[in-house]
C-alpha cells in the first residue's frame, strides 16, 4: 500500500495561526498589558540603542548602513544582542536577548528588533503570546523593524513603534536627531542675529 500526497490544504494551518494570533491579542488585552510599551517614554534623543538581530543578516546591514551615515555626527551608541529571528528558536533567543538587555536596563534608551530579507516567511513566532507579552511589558520602548509589509504581527502591534523595514527603523531614530539639529541651528542663527543687532544699535 502506498500513499501519495498530491496536494496540501493550507486552510487548517492558516486557521490555526489566525486563532493563535487572535487568542494572543485577546489575552494581552484581558491582562491590560497590550498598550503598556506604547505608554513608555522615549527620550528626546534616543542615542543608546540595544539592537536584537543577527550581525550577518541583510536587515541588520541595512540598519547599520543607514545609521552609520550619521553615526559620528549624532554619537549614536549601538549594542548588538544576537538572536534567531524566525523559526523554532526565535522566541527563546529573542526573549533571552531581552532579558540580557533588561539586566542592563540603565545602559539603554530603546530596543529595536531588526529582521529583514526573508519576506513574510517565518513570522508565526511574532504572533505567539509569550514573545508579544515580553515586548508589551518591557520597561523601555521597543521599536520593531522585522521587514515585511502585509499583516501586522502581535509583537509589532504591542511594540512602542512598528517600522516596516530595518531601514525605516533607523530613519525613525535619526529623525529625532534631525529635528533637534534643525532646532539648534535655528536658535543659534536667532542668537547670532540678535547679538549682531544689539551691537549695531
Indicate residue ranges for each PLM-predicted region.
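Short glycine/threonine-rich loop/turn motifs
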Residues: 50-201
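Short, glycine/charged-enriched hinge/interface segments at domain edges or termini
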Residues: 1-81
Amino acid at each position: 500500500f502506498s500513499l501519495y500526497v498530491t496536494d496540501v490544504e493550507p486552510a487548517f494551518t492558516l486557521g490555526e495561526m489566525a486563532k493563535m494570533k487572535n487568542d494572543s491579542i485577546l489575552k494581552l488585552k484581558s491582562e491590560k498589558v497590550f498598550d503598556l510599551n506604547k505608554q513608555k517614554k522615549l527620550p528626546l534623543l534616543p542615542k543608546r540603542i540595544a539592537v536584537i538581530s543577527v550581525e550577518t543578516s541583510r536587515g541588520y546591514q541595512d540598519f547599520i548602513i543607514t545609521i552609520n551615515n550619521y553615526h559620528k555626527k549624532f554619537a549614536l551608541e549601538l549594542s548588538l544582542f544576537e538572536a534567531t529571528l524566525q523559526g523554532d528558536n526565535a522566541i527563546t533567543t529573542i526573549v533571552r536577548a531581552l532579558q540580557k538587555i533588561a539586566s542592563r536596563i540603565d545602559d539603554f534608551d530603546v530596543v529595536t528588533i531588526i529582521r529583514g530579507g526573508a519576506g513574510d516567511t517565518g513570522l508565526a513566532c511574532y504572533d505567539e503570546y509569550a514573545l508579544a507579552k515580553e515586548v508589551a511589558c518591557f520597561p523601555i520602548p521597543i521599536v520593531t523593524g522585522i521587514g515585511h509589509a502585509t499583516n501586522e504581527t502581535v509583537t509589532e502591534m504591542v511594540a512602542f513603534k512598528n517600522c516596516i523595514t530595518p531601514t525605516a527603523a533607523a530613519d525613525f531614530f535619526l529623525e529625532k536627531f534631525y529635528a533637534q539639529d534643525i532646532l539648534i541651528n535655528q536658535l543659534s542663527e536667532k542668537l547670532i542675529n540678535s547679538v549682531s543687532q544689539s551691537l549695531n544699535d
